[in-house]
């Protein structure tokens, strides 16, 4: 049995990240999703035995295969939590632990993943919160809980883990909390994302960032 598998759920590439549509075209957003996924998988490959990507979108699965990931076609009439359950069933009996991460956290490489995985050998449940009360990483045994990835999922996951007596351990990380949804998030990538595929792509798009004293902390523009 392997030590740990990563699970990455991806819905689609096309017409995604619509909150960025005033700033990036549909094709640009599609490419952004691909390079962010590449950053996530490049980091995880250093630390996990296999990376499992689950999606119902054939284009996503084909791209995942080009990255040498294990791919699972998501069942019909599914949702994110059902998809994760399907992926965890695949992992159960193959890996002692699983690490669930989203595909849009390109700064994951700045987090000490090795430390978290080492800690997971003696801890039952590790969780990393995202901005706005969500969840951007869980490390646990496959199917240790049924995930609750909707709304304020961080508190829900902690409550469920406590009810299961898993003694959840919280790891706060600015870089892991940064899932990309807004232009200001792109600015953070430009500041902190040195040597990432995502920052390189944003530079190709001539994305610029500077400090700002208005309603947003950063002013993000294209030249």
Where are each of the predicted segments found?
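Short glycine-enriched, charge-decorated loop/helix-capping segments at active-site entrances
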Residues: 20-28
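Short phosphate-binding loop-to-helix
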Residues: 65-99
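Active-site acidic Asp-centered loop
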Residues: 101-103
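Conserved donor-nucleotide/metal-binding helix-loop-beta segment in metal-dependent transferases, i.e.
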Residues: 108-133
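Conserved alpha/beta core of the MobA/IspD/sugar-nucleotide pyrophosphorylase nucleotidyltransferase superfamily
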Residues: 160-223
């Amino acid at each position: 049995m392997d030590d740990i598998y990563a699970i990455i759920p991806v819905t689609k590439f096309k017409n995604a990240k619509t909150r960025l549509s005033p700033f990036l075209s549909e094709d640009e957003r599609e490419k952004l999703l691909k390079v962010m996924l590449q950053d996530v998988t490049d980091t995880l490959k250093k630390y996990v035995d296999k990376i499992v990507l689950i999606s119902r979108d054939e284009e996503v699965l084909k791209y995942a295969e080009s990255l040498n990931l294990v791919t699972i076609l998501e069942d019909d009439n599914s949702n994110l939590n059902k998809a994760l359950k399907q992926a965890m069933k695949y992992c159960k009996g193959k890996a002692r632990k699983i690490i669930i991460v989203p595909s849009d956290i390109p700064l994951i490489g700045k987090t000490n993943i090795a430390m978290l995985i080492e800690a997971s050998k003696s801890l039952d449940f590790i969780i990393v919160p995202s901005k706005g009360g969500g969840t951007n990483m869980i490390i646990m045994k496959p199917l240790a809980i049924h995930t609750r990835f909707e709304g304020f999922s961080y508190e829900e996951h902690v409550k469920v883990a406590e009810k299961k007596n898993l003694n959840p351990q919280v790891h706060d990380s600015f870089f892991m909390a940064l899932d990309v949804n807004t232009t200001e998030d792109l600015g953070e990538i430009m500041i902190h994302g040195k040597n990432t595929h995502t920052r390189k792509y944003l530079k190709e798009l001539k994305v610029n960032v500077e400090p700002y004293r208005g309603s947003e902390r950063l002013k993000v523009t294209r030249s």
